[in-house]
Structures are given as structure tokens and as C-alpha cells.
Amino acid sequence: MAERADLVFHNKVIDGAAMKRLISRLIDHFGMAYTSHILDQVKTLGFQQATATSISLGIDDLLTIPSKGWLVQDAEQQSLILEKHHHYGNVHAVEKLRQSIEIWYATSEYLRQEMNPNFRMTDPSNPVHLMSFSGARGNASQVHQLVGMRGLMSDPQGQMIDLPIQSNLREGLSLTEYIISCYGARKGVVDTAVRTSDAGYLTRRLVEVVQHIIVRRTDCGTIRSISVSPRNGVPERIFIQTLIGRVLADDIYIGPRCIAARNQDIGIGLVNRFISFRAQPIHIRTPFTCRSTSWICQLCYGRSPTHGDLVELGEAVGIIAGQSIGEPGTQLTLRTFHTGGVFTGGTAEHVRAPFNGKIKFNEDLVHPTRTRHGHPAFLCSIDLYVTIESQDIIHNVNIPPKSLILVQNDQYVESEQVIAEIRAGAATLNFKEKVRKHIYSESEGEMHWSTDVYHAPEYTYGNVHLLPKTSHLWILAVGTCRYSIVSFSLHKDQDQINAHSLSLEERYISDLSVTKDLARHQLFSSDSSSKKRGGTFDYARPDGSISNGHWNLQYPFILHENSDFLAKRRRNKFIIPLQYDQERDKELIPHFGVSIEIPINGILRRNSILAYFDDPRYRRNSSGITKYGAVEVDSILKKEDLIEYRGTKELSPKYQTKVDRFFFIPEEVHVLPGSSLIMVRNNSIIGVDTPLTLNIRSRVGGLVRVERKKKSIELKIFSGDIHFPGETDKISRHSGILIPPGTGKMTSKESKKLKNWIYVQRITPTKKKYFVSVRPVVTYEIADGINLATFFPKDLLQEGDNIQLRVVNYILYGNGKPIRGISHTSIQLVRTCLVLNWHQEEKSSIEDSHASFVEIKTNDLTCNFIRIELGKSPLLYTGKRNSVVSSGLINHNGLDYLNSNPFYSKAKIPSLTKQKGTGGTLLNGNKECQSLKILLSSNYSRIGPFNGLKYNTVTKQSIKADPVTPIRNCLGLLGTVVLKIANFYSSCHLITYNKTLLKKYFLIENLSQTFQGIIFFLIDENRGIYNLDPCSKTVFNPFDLNWRFFHHDYCDETSTLITLGQIFCENVCLFKYGSQKKSGQVIIVHVDYLVIRSAKPYLATPGATVHGHYGETLHEGDTLVTFIYEKSRSGDITQGLPKVEQVLEVRSIDSISTNLEKRVKAWNERISRILGNPWGFLISTELTIAQSRISLVNKIQKVYRSQGVQIHNRHLEIIVRQVTSKVLVSEDGMSNVFLPGELIGLLRAERAGRALDEAISYRAILLGITRASLNTQSFISEASFQETARVLAKAALRGRIDWLKGLKENVVLGGIIPVGTGFKKLVHHSRQHKNIHLEIKNKNLFEGKMRDILFHHREFLSSCIPNNFQ
């Protein structure tokens, strides 16, 4: 060694990496023993210097960064702008969350970067600054939380909390910040113990799987290998780590020169030569390529990680591998509490301007683009030099490629302004996961959307829809009666209602009738009559089912056969009575009745079905097939014409036959799960009450047909005779024909005449043999349908009225289609339908009719009706926008409203009779009736229809003097059908029920108010009708912040931009004097003002899931939409350790992109189908296992590397090899060797397949470490792991033998473990061992013959069929 005076003094700080290099060089030069003495001296020196320095830490040493104040203020300003955009509907909730996280993360990271320069400038010897580079708990992230800001926190599920902690631990936390800090940090002894025990349990399971893996041979002789190439995008560091310590499987050539030979171990020098020469792909030996799964050889394992030479014989490499994977998990568990749950995801890094100045860069090197948030930016494809010039300073910044420039050239920038965004590294961006986020409604209202939506495939009949493109979802403001079910009020559509006058009360209606107390309830009284007039009415939604404890009906309206028709009111309308007996509950709903079908919106198209009748004569309780013979059928109802019900659709097509007869061939059908054990054979003949499965017996006797499908088994029993035809029998040539009576039947040599129809079907169990099944047939004659016309009076159909009713019979099932009956239900074969039609007048364009259900109630008598009204709805409509429509005061020829119209109270009528109200005439398209709408200052109300009204003009001055809002020159307003059946002056009033909500209702106490139940329609300039919500049950309070009025004066040019029903966002400029302060929908367009209905927009992206129907009323907190988005996984080890466990246990996780189980199934199916047996099973299993092994290793390594933990691949490969070493015997090919569902080793399955004549069907399976621990060769090892009693009982029943080859079973029994020094005993040669060797040689001779047979397939396989070593 050189003299001390000759040594060079290196004044350099030695960190962890430098210390590693020093120790490595010392070992190379001086060896292990001398190096240990040197390291002892280094340790002593370190402790002496630390004692002499005596660094202490005080609270005054925590210096806050000066730039923190304006950084936090800038982030808050950005968050405020983001919140405004979200409120305007420009940014959806997920984007808002993501941008908010990125804003605060960038702020926190910039503070952390500013921390070290600040310390170096102000106090370089600060103890906190010195500790920030010591590692472990003393790192920059810890110090940043002390003097910077804690930033964003992760909750226990790994989700980011979007509210950041702006304070640091030096300043102290507020109450909210403290709660979030506790929520995110999740410190505590209990949690620490749980996490540590999880890592310990993982280690135990890993050791259980591989404890028997020992290095037993020097070379197994394999010629398999795994290819590693530096060219396929693998980072150089990972490439070096993969190669060092391995053994080459093939020679490496560069040109004609061999630079490395087979079975040579790879050192760092050889790896550097590979990298410098860029050699061809390198084939190495790994534990995957070793021939046996119960041990491993020296060359397949490679170098020992302890001393750098080839691993010694007898080394327990399995236990080393298990602990190498599990122990970092124990360490990393504690890292959670070092950083306190702070989010450290990968987001973009910002570049800020150092001072005020003008920025310059080469515009030719950038091209315009947008950021991921949609903001304009420039993208640079190569390195870009940006210059910032001030008066006396010039600053140059180098922007790396693929970064975004957020400012323009020659733009003036301020100090600390963000000028560029450097994209995050690929490693952090790749580590993502898919997350679902539910968005909830912030207010009560009706849901609308502005684009077409699709039904989600898994929710075809539900209310879940998918958005095909970006659009807005709107919640239109509405005040609903949450508990109201049936409203016993006087209000009609567009009547005004005062919501405060409603007292809500819950009651239970015991049956479908109204209670007598309600019938006697007097809702109002009129002064014009001495008799009290009682009545209630409401509007129906005939779209659901009634439930009253006794009945559940899909079609709630039943027509009795003894019903009497009342009367026909007008030409284009007729009324059908619905009567029922209130006393007899059991006879309330007849068993067979006529059902009325009316859509949700109440609109019946031409030739639509009004009612139908299910004849019990055409009802069957068994499955079967319908046949029409040779008669053609016409499908008269397409799919789009079917009647829809809420949540369900009647999808069975209806067929109208042209004959009077059809046939039903009965059969017994059982649909069983795919795993069911069937006790009968296909094409066998059984008797009645024969057991089919363990718990199912046949109801009839006959021929059994078994059809296996993907996930189920269909078992059919054909009753009838079996006929074995002769060569000349003509019947046997046909398959599936109907034979009429009177035809000869060949049963024997004699011919018998048939008395009934029969169905002949040809059965071919094999190619040569066949027989004929003769099955009985049930014949149905289609009689004329029930004459529904008898329910109506004669004058209805004989008066030459527009309306026509037609009776049509439908067969509900197609010709030859199988009919499957659900248990305990009957099958209806024929349905008799009443089809609605009407005469088409020359000038009329009536294409639909409106139907509704009404109930007239007088005294204690109640009558139900169906009202059908033809023609366009007399909706409220006016002409052009700028035309002047007569507007004036009401003077109905001195009519006293107070006495004649009971709809208005005394408080409201004087304002009309004193001629102070204002109204506008609103004409419908046909000008057959007029409707007058009046807006008062206190509420809304509507009068009409009236004929012959006279109007006087008024001036604007009188309007200003009176607090009545005018509707002069109204373009249109939201209105509904004018109910012609309502007689304002009669003693009875109408009521219909909301049939889906019969459990509760509310009662009106203050009867002097008028009320409004809104059912909306929109009319545009082209007279198009938009049905916004045909079945809503909503209540408006016009002055409860749901309506907004503003007066403005805009010119005619800009007025064309505003259309009725238009929905716009907040801050949109509607006219020249300013922007709209609140989002909403235009419901009235007037020359002087608009009426806006408040609305809340929600932006939704393509693929989002919308919950609910269009127009459905949502309450606050209801789920509105669900987003699916990708987010960066936070760099918290609590996300890593459970994921390692899930991968090793082979559980499917959403965040793993490729599901290995699906990949296994796909490989099995494709290759088995291409190659056939036995090669299909062999090759598909080999390729599947090889691919799955590599994928599993990569996924586990990805988790550990993301945490900075380096584990050699060979440890993972030993574990994964055991997880994938078993195959599952399938049920496709029944063999006499293995049972279906049995787990056997892959090598054993290949060996048995070669030795036997028949192929063994098996498929690859990924066990997981727990199942692999319970499926080993040693039952003692399994029993000591878990489920001891079950494992020992099964082993005793099977007579299993434990050969005590592993470590654990020898430890349990107190024997010498076969590793280390105990390994020599196993390799000691004796006579017995020689005999065994001879037997193995004989066996190998036999296998050599098999390999000669399979020789020509070697080129197809990546490796040849291996010999078996025991």
C-alpha cells in the first residue's frame, strides 16, 4: 500500500451511490476480508464526526419560503377561474378535479424546487437544509412539508382530495387542514401493524410456494431459452440488470467471430461488449427454461447474488426468492408514513419567467396545438431556446422537446409567469388506472339533454344511457311535491299553483278505489247554486303498474264485459267507461279481461293497438313449437311500432295469419347450468318420472335430446312414438313435417289411418343410423276475436264517425320458433287486439290521437273513462314575432266571473271585473277556439277556452301603473292540450290517478288558491311541437327563485337569435346591453321581455353514462351522470403492495390493462381450433404459460420499480414458475387417467399424453400463490400452511405419499433438511440409486421412440419435448 503522504486528498461529498462504488472497488482490489476492516474504520469515523458536529434542530431553523404567498394566491386565482368555467358548463366535473389537482401539485412542486436555492442563499449551514439530503426520513419531501406546503393529500383508497393543505407544519394547520391531514396521513400503530402483517403474510405465502426449490444439478440439459434484445425499447439500465448474473443459452457471434459461448455466465464486461457491438438478440437461461418444476439447476439459476459466482449445489434458492420479494414489501409499508400520504403523481412541470420582459423564440420550430385542457399553445418538436429580454438583462431558457409554449412570440411576460409546460416523464404517465366518478345533481329539477343518447348494452330495458358525443345535461328548475302521489286539487294544465298552500300528508290507499271520505270532501263552493258541488280532478300517467297489496298489474286498466257505454260528446272524440265494484275486492280484477294499451305520452298513432284480449283457450302451460303448416305469415308490427312501457319493452313480434288454423307441438324443456350432472343420455328413451338430474324428474316420457351450449345445457323430451323406417318408407325422407288425418302411417307391415294431426321429425344419432320421431300435435282453430264493438253504443260506430275500431287476431310466436315457458307461468299463443283507426279527411292531416284516463265523481258515485281525442292539440300559438296581436282588457259582456266560474276565488276575480288585468289572445292553428292567458303579480292563471271575447286596447302607461305583467305580442308559451271534456259550469269535475304512485297523496287546505300542474309542450315558429315532459308531475311556484323576469329593449336584428325553448348557459350575450346573468330556458318571448326558467348545465363527455330518463324529475343528490376516466396512480406504496399481492394471487383488477385469465382462454381456444388434438393442447398450453409468465414478471417489476426498489428477475421467475406449473384437466375429452377438474403438473400431463393412445384435454391455469401452496407434492407442507384437517383427510382418502423432498416437511418431522450440508446425503451413490438410474434409462429409451415419432414437429415448437427428471 502507498505511503500516507503519497495519497491524494479528494475533497468530495460521498453519498449513497458513491459509497456503493467505493465498496465495489475495494472488494475488487483487496477482497472481502480486508474490505470489512476498512468499512469498520469508515463507520467509526462517521460516528466521531457526527458527534463532533452535534447538529441540533430547532423551530427557528424552519425558514418559510418568501415566494409562497404569491404562488398560493396565483393558484387560488386559477382555481376560481376554473370554478367559473365549471359553473358556466364549459368544464365537466372530472376535468375540474384533474385541473385543480394539477394546479396545486405544480404549485407545491415549484415551492419544493425553490426551497434549496433559498436555503443556499440565506443560510447554507442550516441544519434543516443539511438534513434534507440525508435520505430516509430526511429528504426534500419531508423538509418541504415543514417549510413549504403539505399540498394535496391522498385518502386511504388512493383517491386525491382536491382541497389542498396550503399551510406547512411550521405555520400550523387550520381545523379543516388538520382533518384532511389526518384523513390522508392515516398514521397510527394499528394501521402500521396491519400493513406490516400484510407484507409478512405475503412473504409467508411466497415461501410456502417455493420452499422446496433447491439447486440439485449442475446442468439440466435444456435447449430452451428466453430472448433479450437491447433494441426493443428496453431501457439500458433494465437491460443490464436483466443480463448480469445470467448464463448464456447459445453462442454469441459478431460476424464469424464468437465472443461468448453457451453456458458462460455474463458479467459486466460481457454486457458492455453486447451494448457496444449491438449484437443480435441474446438467448439466456432462466428458471423458466429449467426442465423440472421441483428443483433447479446451477446454469438456469446463474450467479449467486451474495458472492458473484455460480450458485452452489444445495442452495435453497426458493426461500431466498420468496424473502427477496416479500421483505421489500415490509420496508415499503413504512414509507407511507414518511411522506404522510402526500400525493406525488406525475404531472407537467412549469417553466416560469425570472423577471418582467419580452419573450422571443423561433416561430418556425413550433406549431400551434392545444393543451390537454383545451387552451391554445405551441408545441416544440426539438430543443427550443427561449430568450427573455429586459432593459438590462437577457435570460436564456432551453425548452426540451415535446414541451408546450404557453405564450406568443414577442409577448410581454411578467415575473414568475408560466411560459412553458414540460411534459411529465413517460414512466409516470404510463402508470395509470381507470376510475369511475359519479356526478350528483346539485338541485331539484327536470333532466334534459341536448344530443341523442344510446342505451347501454347491459341496461337495455333500464334508464341508463350512453352519450355518443360531448353535450350538456340540463337540470331545469322545478319545485316538486316530493311526497305527492295523487293530487286532489282543482288545477288543470297551466293553472297557477301556490306551493305553500299544499299540506302534505301520507296515507295508504287500501284498494284502487277512492275512499268515501275523499269522495265527500268538498273542494269548493259556489254562490250561484244552493247545492254544494264537489269534485276532484288530476292528470294521469298510464305507464306503470298498480300495487295495492293485493294485485300487481302490468296493464292497470281493465275493461269489464258488463260495462255500459255512457255517451259520445263530440265528433272527434269518444269515451269508454271503466267500471269496477268497490265492495268485492276479489272480483275487482277479473282473471281474463280486456287490457287497455296507451303509451306514456298518451298519443295513439294510426293503426295502433288500443286494447287486447288474451283468450284462455289459447293458453298453454308447457313449452313447445308453433307451426302454421305451409301458410305464409305477415309481420304487421315492426319493432319501432311496439308499445313502450317505463323500463321495459314488449319485444315479441306479432304475426297475423291468413288461415284459421295453427298447430302447437308440445315438448318438455329444461335449461340447466353448464356444470350440471345429467343422468340421461342423448337420443335415449325414458319414461315418466325419470330422474334427469339430481333434483329434476321428467313429467312426460319420450325421446331425450341434449344440446350443449356455451354456458348452459338444454334438455328436451319429445313425447310420442319412435318409428324405425324401412328402406321404402317415404315418411322417413322428410324431416319436420305435419301429416294431416287420414294419411297412412307405417308402424309395421300394416297401414293404419291417422285420426289426428301428427308431427314427424327425423333423428340422426349417427351417420348411418336414423329413426323418426312421431309426435302428437295440438290443433288450434282461430275463431273470431271477441267483439269489442259491443261495448260501445250503436250510434258510435253507425253514425259515420271518424273513429273506427277493428278486431285483429295475432299469433304471438313465429312459425317454427321454440316457445319456452318460465316456471309457473302460462304461455299465450293468440292475442285478440282492438286496432284504432279513423277516416282521413281531404284537408286534414291528423296522424295521431290523444288518449287519457279520467274519472268523474258525483256524490258517492265514481265512473272511469278513457277519452280519445283526434286532431292536433289546440296548443297556444301566435303568428310572427313582430306582428301586433290585439291585447287588451277583459270584458266578457258583463259576465260575472265570480258566480259563473268556480275556478277563481273572490280575491282574484275583482282584478278582472274592475278591468285592471291585462291579457293577450292566443290563437291555435285552426282558429277553432281561443285561449286567454293572464299574468298577475301574485301568481299565474289561465282562463279558457272562451269564444266571442271582446278586447280593448290599453297603453303602456296603464300597464306601468298596474303591477300586472303584460303578455302582449307573445311569440308562444309553454302550454298543453285544452281539455274539451272539462265543463267549467257542471257540478262534476274530473280526476285521474298517477297510477305508479298510489301510496300517498296530499290534501289541499287553503281552497281559495288556484293551482297549477305543469305538463309542458313547446311550440316553435314552424308550429313544431316539442313534448318536453309528457308525464311529469311537477308544481311550480313562480316566485320561489325558479322563474326569472327581466325587461330589456333589444333591436329586431338581435331578437332573431332568441327562440322559444332555447337553453343557454350563464354569461351568454343575448342582447346588446349585456350578458345573461343566469343560465336557463326561454319559455316566453315578448317584444319587451323574456321569461327565463332557471337551469343548471352539466358538461358530459363521450362515453359517459347518464342515469334517468329524459324529462325525469331528479331530486338533490340523485346520481346524474357517471364518468370513466384515466388518472395517474399516486406514488404511494399502499397502492403498490396490494397490487403485487393481487397479481401474485391472479385476481382480476381494473387497473391492470390485460387480464391474464382472458388471455389464457383465448390462446387455448384459438390454437386448439387451429391445430386440433393432441398438438392443440400441448402447444397452446406451452405458449400460454410462456406468455403469462413474462407478463406476470413484468407487472410485478413495474410496481416495485415505480417505488425505486430493485429486485432481480430470477427471484420473481422462481415464484411465477410455480404459480404457472399446473394445468387443469378439462371435460372435453374424458380420459381414464385423470379426472375432469384435476390439477396436474404440466410435465406430467405432457408425459402422459405421449405415453397414451388417446389425447388428454387440458388447459393452462394461473393458480395464485395461495392455491399453489395448497397444491404441492407434499401434503405435510400443505397441512402446515392452512386448512389442516381438510388437507390431511383428503390425503388419507387418496392414499397420498409424501417423499419429503422439501424443507418444510423435513422440519415438521424433525429430519435433516435437504439443503446445504444435508444435501450430500441425497447425492450419495448406493446400489439402490444405481437401480433407479437404470430404470430411468429404460424409461428414456421409450421416450426416445416417442420423440422420433414427433420429430417433424420440432421446427414448429420453440423448444423440443423435454425429458423428465425426477
From Swiss-Prot:
EC number(s) reported in the record: 2.7.7.6
Subcellular localization(s) per the UniProt record: Plastid, Chloroplast
Catalysed reaction, written as an equation: RNA(n) + a ribonucleoside 5'-triphosphate = RNA(n+1) + diphosphate
UniProt-recorded Gene Ontology molecular function terms: DNA binding; DNA-directed RNA polymerase activity; zinc ion binding
Domain of life: Eukaryota
Chief localisation class: plastid
InterPro entries: DNA-dir_RpoC2_beta_pp, RNA_pol_beta''_euk, RNA_pol_Rpb1_3_sf, RNA_pol_Rpb1_4, RNA_pol_Rpb1_5, Rpb1_funnel_sf
A GO cellular component entry from the record: DNA-directed RNA polymerase complex
Cofactor stoichiometry and binding remark: Binds 1 Zn(2+) ion per subunit.
GO biological process annotation, one example: DNA-templated transcription
Spans through the membrane: none
Cofactor names: Zn(2+)
Family stated for the protein in its record: Belongs to the RNA polymerase beta' chain family. RpoC2 subfamily.
PANTHER family reported for this sequence: DNA-DIRECTED RNA POLYMERASE SUBUNIT BETA
Subunit annotation: In plastids the minimal PEP RNA polymerase catalytic core is composed of four subunits: alpha, beta, beta', and beta''. When a (nuclear-encoded) sigma factor is associated with the core the holoenzyme is formed, which can initiate transcription.
Name this polypeptide is given: DNA-directed RNA polymerase subunit beta''
Gene designation per UniProt: rpoC2
